[in-house]
Amino acid sequence: MAGNTIGQLFRVTTFGESHGIALGCIVDGVPPGIPLTEEDLQHDLDRRRPGTSRYTTPRREPDRVKILSGVFEGRTTGTSIGLLIENTDQRSQDYGAIKELYRPGHADFTYDGKYGFRDYRGGGRSSARETAMRVAAGAIAKKYLDMKHGIKVRGYLAQMGDVVCELKDWQQVEQNPFFSPDVDKLDALDELMRALKKEGDSIGAKVAVMAENVPVGLGEPVFDRLDADLAHALMSINAVKGVEIGDGFAVVNQRGSEHRDEIRANGFQSNHAGGILGGISSGQTITANLAMKPTSSITVPGKTITRSGEEVEMITKGRHDPCVGIRAVPIAEAMMAIVLMDHLLRHRAQNADVHVDMPHG
């Protein structure tokens, strides 16, 4: 079956291609009475949209979202919310030369192998352009989580190449085009991007995302553990090749005496688990890291084949991001928010009558 939907009670279904007429999504499960306007969604869309700095793709899309249904007089009605974003800056002629080629590192080869037919313009459905609708839907979830439960979801660029950004100042994240919380690393990031542009190459990145004030109890063991669903959602983002929850792969070098999050009367003494124990939220901050591959859309010549099997050398033309991790921050926030809202609704549906006087954690 087509994998265009995520969530059970809070369900998001997206549609559209990179160079199609428009992108859209249907959001089901939003409780009624939530104040919601297009401007509520536009803030995060503006953070994600292309053409906003010299470090991202020059494709200039306004990404103005339209609410088609599910909202009346500024409040959600409880019915399906339809969202639409028109594509306005397609340059499909940039892709005519690759109609018969498989771009190395892209989904061209696998989409052809699966469907026997593909939209080669900008990658079609496989393009990260689709994530605009995830961000729009995620903005709804972020508003609900914050307004009703005080849950805040936010992320930042943790690393680009060898440049590591420390979490020094959250306010800085929105003040620079890199989403970096470390103002001391901005010059190094700028130098790296300039070098990549000169070389016609790209670089990978690590994006961090977290949720604060998440209550104890979210997650449905055993197959719908909260960390499993978060990993699924975050891995579904284009270019993500790895997801860590908490300390992630660093646990390989840790001892049990170090990794266990000891609990005292004043709460947990550490958070190596990333806010999730046994697949259920512990009440601590949920933390995750995403490893993002360097984009294969570069001007460095590469070897590939045509649909008929002929070996050729190609250079990718078009407008692309030298580091996809920069614009991935609002996408990661959206996917985490979508999962958390879905699990909040699922927890309420099954456990509404459960009241436990938990000690402070």
Curated annotation (Swiss-Prot):
NADP(+) binds at R48, R54. Keywords: Amino-acid biosynthesis, Aromatic amino acid biosynthesis, FAD, Flavoprotein, FMN, Lyase, NADP. It holds the Pfam family Chorismate_synt. Pathway: Metabolic intermediate biosynthesis; chorismate biosynthesis; chorismate from D-erythrose 4-phosphate and phosphoenolpyruvate: step 7/7. Reduced FMN (FMNH(2)). GO terms for molecular function: chorismate synthase activity; FMN binding. The keyword Transport does not apply. One of its GO terms (biological process) is aromatic amino acid family biosynthetic process. It catalyses: 5-O-(1-carboxyvinyl)-3-phosphoshikimate = chorismate + phosphate. Its EC number is 4.2.3.5. Residues 40-49 have a biased composition (Basic and acidic residues). One of its GO terms (cellular component) is cytosol. The keyword Flavoprotein applies. Residues 37-59 are annotated as: Disordered. Belongs to the chorismate synthase family. NCBIfam families: aroC, PRK05382.1. This reaction introduces a second double bond into the aromatic ring system. Homotetramer. This is Chorismate synthase. It comes from Erwinia tasmaniensis (strain DSM 17950 / CFBP 7177 / CIP 109463 / NCPPB 4357 / Et1/99). The gene is aroC.
